[in-house]
Structure formats: structure tokens, C-alpha cells
């Protein structure tokens, strides 16, 4: 099932598709908060986020906020309507992230927001289905069904795209750290600290060692440039 690039590019350009992603992401966040309960965001996280956004020229004028939910595990993801969702496990005793590592985690999510990766993933699903009459949630359900049917290699293809996105977000996140005056190597330290099984490692996220190698290579390229 090849990706239809015409459908993909059209989807990315359409404001109606953006509204579909916005509605879908808002519902997902609401469902998450309803399931776990909302948690207060530590002031440190808000101040670090403000520093990162202020330093990033690609986010100028955008209002981005943090939302937290009550869960002991660690997870973070972005929503297309300018929200970064973080589990309270991010500041639990088992995690103990330094400020620059907090910045690294948030910078990774900001990189996803820059690229509109939430919409990009949805438009990829539509482009694989090839039926532009479908809504984006319907296209996602269709590709999910196809991925688990065992009738195609779509699951491997989508996983490869997702893994490439994560590596790109790591590299761009390190650049955002540098722009904000943080050590870009905090990205690799954050990844290493969060390396225990089940954290940022799955079919949608590359192995931690591969991500660390990639981000260090990107930092070195920038550091060695004239």
C-alpha cells in the first residue's frame, strides 16, 4: 500500500484537516484527564517551557501550555492545538530530571509541534488509504485495522516513519536547547536516564542507543560547522 504523496500534501495544506486533528487531539487529552485526573504542573516546568518557546524563532507568537495528568509512569506527548501533555511521573522520585533534562524532554515535544507531526501522522494514514472522503480519525482506524490484519507490511512502514520522526525531534530538540542556552547534550542524558524498559522504546520509537547516537551526531555536526 504505497503512500499517495498528492493526497498527503493536499491534506497537510487543508485547514479543514487541521480542524479534524485539533478536535481529535482535544478529545484524546480530555479522555486522558478523565481517566487519570489532572495534576498540577510544577512551576519549574512552566518556566523552562517559556524559556524554550521564547528562544525558538519557529514558535514565535504561539501559545503553548503544559497539561499534566496523575500517573506514576513517565510519558509526554504533544497535541496539535499547542499543548504538551506530561504525566506526573516526570517529576516523581524515580525520575529526578535536572533542569536541562526537563528542557530536553520539552524541547523534543516542541520539535514535534514545529513539524505538525500530529497532523503529519494523520495525513499519512489518509494518504495510505487513498480515500479523501474519509475523515482523518476514520483513516487512522483504517490503517490501524490494516496494520494488524497481517495482510500487508503497512505496520512496518508506519513504524519506520514514526521512528524517523522521533529521531528528527531529538535532533531538532537539541538545537532548541542550544538556542535557549541549555547544553544540547542534555538531550542524550535525558534519553539515557529514561532508558529503562517501556520508556520511550517501542515499535514507534527507535531503541534508545540508536536515538542517542543520532542526536550526538547531529550535535557534533552543528558544533563543527563554520
Predicted regions and their residues:
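A Zn2+-metalloprotease active-site environment signal
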Residues: 1-226
Amino acid at each position: 500500500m504505497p503512500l499517495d504523496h498528492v493526497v498527503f500534501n493536499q491534506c497537510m495544506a487543508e485547514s479543514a484537516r487541521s480542524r479534524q486533528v485539533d478536535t481529535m487531539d482535544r478529545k484524546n487529552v480530555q479522555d486522558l484527564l478523565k481517566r487519570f485526573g489532572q495534576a498540577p504542573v510544577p512551576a519549574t516546568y512552566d518556566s523552562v517551557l517559556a524559556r524554550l518557546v521564547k528562544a525558538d524563532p519557529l514558535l514565535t507568537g504561539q501559545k503553548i501550555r503544559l497539561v499534566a495528568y496523575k500517573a506514576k509512569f513517565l510519558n509526554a506527548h504533544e497535541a496539535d492545538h499547542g499543548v504538551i501533555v506530561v504525566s506526573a511521573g516526570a517529576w516523581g522520585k524515580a525520575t529526578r530530571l535536572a533542569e536541562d533534562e526537563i528542557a530536553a524532554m520539552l524541547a523534543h515535544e516542541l520539535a514535534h509541534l514545529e513539524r505538525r507531526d500530529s497532523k503529519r501522522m494523520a495525513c499519512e494514514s489518509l494518504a495510505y488509504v487513498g480515500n479523501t472522503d474519509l475523515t482523518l480519525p476514520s483513516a487512522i482506524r483504517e490503517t490501524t485495522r490494516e496494520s494488524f490484519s497481517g495482510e500487508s507490511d503497512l505496520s512496518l512502514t508506519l513504524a519506520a516513519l514514526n521512528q524517523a520522526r522521533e529521531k528528527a525531534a531529538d535532533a531538532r530538540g537539541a538545537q532548541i536547547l542550544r538556542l535557549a542556552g541549555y547544553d544540547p547534550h542534555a538531550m542524550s542524558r535525558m534519553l539515557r536516564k529514561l532508558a529503562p524498559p517501556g520508556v520511550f522504546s517501542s515499535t514507534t520509537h527507535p531503541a534508545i542507543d540508536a536515538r542517542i547516537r543520532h542526536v550526538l551526531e547531529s550535535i557534533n555536526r552543528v558544533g563543527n560547522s563554520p
